[in-house]
Amino acid sequence: MYRPKSQRCHKPRDSLFSWSSGFDNFTGLVNWGFLLLTMGGIRLLLENFIKYGIRVDPEQWLIVLTGRHEGGADHPSLILLTYSVVPVVLCLLIEKGLSVEIISYAPGMIAHIINLLVLVMIPMVVIHVKPSGFSLIGATTVCMIYSILFLKLWSYIQVNLWCRNRRSSMSKSHLRRQSLSFHNKNESNSVPNGFVDHEEKNAEATLIHYPDNLNLKDIFYYILAPTLCYELNFPRTNRIRKRFLVKRILEVVVGFQVVMCLFQQWIIPSVKNSLIPFSNMDVAKATERLLKLAIPNHLVWLIFFYLMFHSFLNLVGELLHFADRNFYCDWWNANNIDTFWRSWNMPVHRWAVRHLYKPLVELGYGRMAASVAVFFVSAFFHEYLVSVPLRTYKTWAFMGMMGQIPLSMISKFMEKRYGPRWGNLVVWASLILGQPLCIMMYYHDYVITHIGEDLIDRYGHV
């Protein structure tokens, strides 16, 4: 007969779900959560097909993209895009005059300011005066391009100003040539992915010095380059990787089709069906519509992020031999709103820090005031990119961006009080719920403003 040496089978232990147990392997529960999420997504997709049928129609994409449904036979969007070359050339001519001192500092800066203000105002005036000629896509593209040009020319003007100031202050031959925008010439010689190896002995011969950079080739390379910050010497690659280029092209083409399908099949019906509950201030139904819209909208936003910041910008960078491909950081791990805004759009973040935040701090403004100024400029352009194409000036996007300041404080409090994971949850919640709420508000105001309350029932059903 079996008799164990000890009959004891218990010892002091905590349950696995207790914090004190030290157990942290929940891989099975994560798999369970992904499975439930997948099943829920498939159910929503089937519900959409059963309720609305197949709504994807590529012919409608062409109509929307060309603006044929709005009578745009004279293509004002193409005219404005062509005209965008004019302020670029004007900026170069002013800089040439400043470099040889034909134009003095004050008149030159006034000319630059007028040029930039006119650049921003032209789409607003033309779209308002001739609204029937613009498709929504065309107007949005024009506003986007003109906003990018505004930021690029601001950087171009400021960097050349720094170069002029440094040139005038250099009195000793042994001073470092600070007019060169070249970082760390003595870095490692092994450069991956076809990057050019700038050896120190050849660097001086290949670098561009101010004012030799003031020419059409230089400024138009900068205008096309995937960056908002101007430098006299950008890091370059020495070859185009054909396989990498083909992958990015396929991603852009296929991803664009997926985004258009999701818009037509899922987002448009959800937005239209949210109009009446939102107008009647039916909180329960409006909340249900908000949550229903949140999933496809967030999916489109994620795809758009990948298409823009990975596929398209890498595609442009590869074609132009532009070597700095740091277009985004790990924003998905952001523990607070501040970290998110510093991570998800690196070209804009670098521009804001280099050309707005640091100059304001150097002028004696506090860090908080400089941060508010950055959010204010960002809020203005968010509103500009939404209100001008829609011709609906309600400032929802502006207030949403300015609302990031108190939301940032909340997320930092959650991070410090409850840990980084809760701060990250606040970031994701703001992304998932904030965007569809703005979409619903703008669609409601657009219908009321341009169509009228009498037809709200017609535009509130699919």
Predicted regions and their residues:
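N-terminal signal-anchor/initial transmembrane insertion module
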Residues: 1-106, 462
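Transmembrane alpha-helices of multi-pass eukaryotic membrane proteins
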Residues: 24-40, 69-88, 104-120, 133-148, ...
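Membrane-embedded alpha-helices of multi-pass membrane proteins, especially ion channels
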Residues: 35-55, 83-99, 119-131, 147-159, ...
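Intramembrane catalytic core of multi-pass membrane enzymes that act on lipidic substrates
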Residues: 67-253
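Aromatic/acidic cage segments in peptide-binding pockets
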Residues: 167-171, 400-405
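Membrane-interfacial catalytic/cofactor-binding modules of polytopic membrane enzymes
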Residues: 201-251, 256, 273-387, 391, ...
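Membrane-interface junctions at the ends of membrane-embedded or membrane-associated helices
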Residues: 414-418
